[in-house]
Amino acid sequence: MHYFFIIVIWLLSINTAWADCWLQAEKMFNIESELLYAIAQQESAMKPGAIGHNRDGSTDLGLMQINSFHMKRLKKMGISEKQLLQDPCISVIVGASILSDMMKIYGYSWEAVGAYNAGTSPKRSDIRKRYAKKIWENYRKLKGMSAEEKNKRLSIAANK
């Protein structure tokens, strides 16, 4: 599985203007592209080069605000901080991978969505719920759009 993931990341990195990265992430991880987009809206306001500094000293990088906690594993796969900041498709794929990991723990649920941001500690349950509620609002708005408007947004975000 790791080799497949590395190959996909490599393919995405050579074609950063690829507008279908949201749909590719959806297919790879069986997570709706609209849900991933809703997370990116909340995490970075759709800014691929976004950098967030956290109180615990960690840093969040890129469109999907990938926490520096994951960098040791990502570096072993050949993914750098620079790539997360400069290639939105890599950020989307990595974000989908992290959300998929949370879904292995919590199932396809809003608890898993909350864990994407707040982690799995039982002490952070309320934070997970608040975060999931924000994502739900973004997701609900996106699901209410016409297919044409939705495709336009997904395409624009992939090419930023």
Swiss-Prot record:
Pfam family, one: SLT
Gene coding for it: iagB
Database matches in SUPFAM superfamilies: Lysozyme-like (SSF53955)
N-terminal signal peptide: 1-19
Entry keyword set: Signal, Virulence
Disulfide bonding pattern of the chain: none
Family of the protein in this entry: Belongs to the IagB/IpgF/P19 family.
Naturally occurring in which organism (per UniProt): Salmonella typhimurium (strain LT2 / SGSC1412 / ATCC 700720)
CDD domains reported in the protein's UniProt record: LT_IagB-like
InterPro entries for this protein: Lysozyme-like_dom_sf, Transglycosylase_SLT_dom_1
The protein's name: Invasion protein IagB
